[in-house]
């Protein structure tokens, strides 16, 4: 059996845009040819795409860094550099992508073929043909390509199943799945025989079908990490109906009703919304001695918790080993599924607000910040300013002068004066230093 991996931490980096080119038209019989440098190509984006053939996040165990290629540089004759192809990263259905730093959900990928641009490629820098004006018909200005986005991500796989089997270890969940579907889970007479989720397709005699997941057994304290802990509790989140399997024979020496209460407490502690899912109680091992007496006591205790206006969960006595009582259980499960809508896995507050693709600067975006370093130099920072800086070709005087005009237009010079900067003070942006001229 292949190893199951349902969480992974990875980093992605989109490709940088290609640099624009400074070039001039030099052809015989064409006097004063003017600028002819083309734009750089767009950097490749990193795109997640759902592949229904994948079952785990195992591929991300050994490959944790994904980097798209940069765009090509601009060329002469005003030709654009070639844009890089996007990097397609395949993920299984049910993959939730979160920002590793904030923990916020970026996207939830559940449909086969669904795509999401997780890191946008940088745009290509403009060539000098773009900067020609009547006042400067032969500019020696070109932009560097824009850096691609970089992100640290957490991936979580929550299997897609209509029905989830929950219960203590060794209550018969794996046996139930094996007799109602073609799934072949590992079955044994010891705790935690099931250590990975198993998925099977169930078809009732009435013709209804649904996906059922056998999840590793829970024990008291699972929501705090005891036993297999929360490692597989996340897989219950996508289910619409929960089959709560109870060992009515009390073969492990536990009270069946206390088992029922304990497991529900773990579900509630892990995620309060899990108890919103309708449950069917599967009273298993009814072929064992004293099971009938235990079931009668169970029903009495359960009824005491509900008043006449509450909908008490249905109880189905079965024996998975003897294959008794299963048809009525499956029909009831199919009927409950038909009347139960999908549950919203995340609300709006769980999602991280993603910026739109926008190559200007939003009004809300803070243009720059000024701090003072230990060596008394002034340090400029800020997303807008740093983006302008990295796209400026510092090897060409005209580009540097253009950058200086941009800083002045942003109010950097005035802000430095207000902070007390004097003529000759050192100003730093990244690893680039220059003197402040008042």
Swiss-Prot record:
Q: Which SUPFAM superfamilies match?
A: Obg GTP-binding protein C-terminal domain (SSF102741), Obg GTP-binding protein N-terminal domain (SSF82051), P-loop containing nucleoside triphosphate hydrolases (SSF52540)
Enumerate the residues binding GTP.
167-174, 192-196, 214-217, 284-287, 319-321
Q: In what residue span(s) does the OBG-type G domain sit?
A: 161-338
Q: Which residues form the Obg domain?
A: 2-160
Compartments, record wording: Cytoplasm
Q: Which residues bind Mg(2+)?
A: 174, 194
Q: Region annotation Disordered: residue ranges?
A: 128-147
Alphabetized UniProt keyword annotations: Cytoplasm, GTP-binding, Hydrolase, Magnesium, Metal-binding, Nucleotide-binding
Q: Give every OCT domain span.
A: 360-438
Q: What is its EC number?
A: 3.6.5.-
Cofactor requirement: Mg(2+)
Top-level division of the source organism's lineage: Bacteria
> What Gene Ontology terms for biological process does this UniProt record contain?
ribosome biogenesis
A GO molecular function held by the record: GTP binding
Under the heading PROSITE patterns, the entry gives: G_OBG, GTP1_OBG, OBG, OCT
Query: Which InterPro entries does its entry note?
Result: G_OBG, GTP-bd, GTP-bd_Obg/CgtA, GTP-bd_prot_GTP1/OBG_C_sf, GTP1-OBG_CS, GTP1_OBG_dom, GTP1_OBG_dom_sf, OBG_GTPase
GO CC entries: cytoplasm
Question: What does the UniProt record say this protein does?
Answer: An essential GTPase which binds GTP, GDP and possibly (p)ppGpp with moderate affinity, with high nucleotide exchange rates and a fairly low GTP hydrolysis rate. Plays a role in control of the cell cycle, stress response, ribosome biogenesis and in those bacteria that undergo differentiation, in morphogenesis control.
Q: Which family does it belong to?
A: Belongs to the TRAFAC class OBG-HflX-like GTPase superfamily. OBG GTPase family.
Q: Quaternary arrangement and interactors, per the entry?
A: Monomer.
Q: Could you identify this protein by its name? A: GTPase Obg
Query: Per the UniProt entry, what species is this protein from, by scientific name?
Result: Streptococcus uberis (strain ATCC BAA-854 / 0140J)
């Amino acid at each position: 059996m292949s190893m199951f991996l349902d969480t992974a931490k990875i980093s992605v980096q989109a490709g940088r845009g290609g640099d624009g080119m400074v070039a001039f038209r030099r052809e015989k019989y064409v006097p004063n040819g003017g600028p002819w440098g083309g734009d750089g190509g767009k950097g490749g984006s990193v795109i997640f795409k759902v592949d229904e053939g994948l079952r785990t996040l195992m591929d991300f165990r050994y490959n944790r860094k994904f980097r798209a290629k940069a765009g090509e540089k601009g060329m002469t004759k005003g030709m654009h550099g070639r844009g890089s192809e996007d990097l397609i990263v395949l993920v299984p259905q049910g993959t939730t992508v979160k920002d590793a730093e904030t923990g916020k959900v970026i996207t939830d990928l559940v449909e086969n073929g669904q795509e999401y641009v997780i890191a946008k490629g940088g745009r290509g820098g403009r060539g000098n043909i773009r900067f020609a004006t009547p006042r400067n018909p032969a500019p020696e200005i070109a932009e560097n390509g824009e850096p691609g986005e970089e992100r640290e991500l957490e991936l979580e796989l929550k299997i897609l199943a209509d029905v989830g089997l929950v219960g203590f270890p060794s209550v018969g969940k794996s046996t139930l799945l094996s007799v109602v579907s073609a799934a072949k889970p590992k079955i044994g007479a010891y705790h935690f025989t099931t250590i990975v989720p198993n998925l099977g397709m169930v078809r009732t005699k009435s013709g209804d079908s649904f996906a059922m997941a056998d999840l590793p057994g829970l024990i008291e304290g699972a929501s705090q990490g005891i036993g297999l802990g929360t490692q597989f509790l996340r897989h219950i989140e996508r289910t619409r109906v929960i089959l709560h399997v109870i060992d009515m024979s009390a073969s492990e020496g536990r009270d069946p009703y206390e088992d029922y209460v304990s497991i529900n407490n773990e579900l509630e502690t892990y995620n309060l919304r899990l108890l919103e899912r309708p449950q069917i109680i599967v009273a298993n091992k009814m072929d064992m001695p004293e099971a009938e007496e235990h079931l009668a006591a169970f029903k009495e205790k359960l009824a005491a918790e509900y008043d006449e206006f509450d909908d008490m969960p249905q109880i189905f006595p079965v024996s998975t080993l003897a294959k008794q009582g299963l048809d009525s259980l499956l029909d009831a499960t199919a009927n409950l599924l038909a009347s139960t809508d999908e549950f919203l896995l995340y609300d709006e507050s769980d999602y991280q607000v993603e910026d739109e693709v926008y190559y200007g600067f939003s009004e809300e975006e803070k243009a720059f910040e000024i701090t003072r370093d230990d060596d008394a130099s002034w340090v400029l920072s800020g997303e807008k300013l740093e983006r302008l800086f990295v796209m400026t070709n510092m090897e060409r005087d005209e580009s540097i002068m253009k950058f200086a005009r941009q800083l002045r237009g942003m109010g950097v010079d005035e802000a430095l004066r207000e902070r007390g900067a004097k003529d000759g003070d050192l100003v730093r942006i990244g690893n680039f230093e220059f003197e402040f001229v008042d």
